[in-house]
Amino acid sequence: GSYISVQNAIMALIVKSANDVATVVAEHISGTEREFAKLMTKYARDIGMKNTTFKNASGLPNKAQMTTARDISMLSHKLITKFPKQYDLFKTEKFNWNGKIYKTHNRLMQSYIGADGIKTGYIRASGFQLAFSAVRNNKRLIGVYFGGDTGKQRNQRLSFLMTKAFEGLDIISAKKASIKIKD
């Protein structure tokens, strides 16, 4: 067998969605991937993810496995707020392992102003997916998109939606600043 350090395993999961590494980590932690998925589902319930059931560590297809964009946004928010040091890893655009450089699938990290990370995914049933976070003017937005036909389409649509949401926040802030209170 091969060996991989915990740090490199984490980077492989974040940057390249290394499904084989997800299985190895799950088996190391819980004995089996199935037991690990049960722990993941329990944690999901504990943080309010009511519509998520995990059946494996990687997110690869399983008829009994499901989630929603809302639940993934809750998980993303929890990661950002409860584990800021670990969340910082989700900004990583590339890493080197065994002399090879691996690059992220999250192209918005390079092109979207204020981007600070999170995670891509893909399965045939729900297409190209992305949980994405950006900060502008000290305001953070988390966007989750499922169903892209291509990674490029997913990125364009989520970029558009995030930009519109930030513009909406700016309008709300401007309105609040212009409200006059009568004495």
Residue map of PLM features:
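Active-site-adjacent loops and short helices of periplasmic peptidoglycan-processing enzymes
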Residues: 1-70, 80
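Domain-terminus/edge residues, biased toward the C-terminal soluble/receptor-binding domains
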Residues: 49-53, 61-66, 70-183
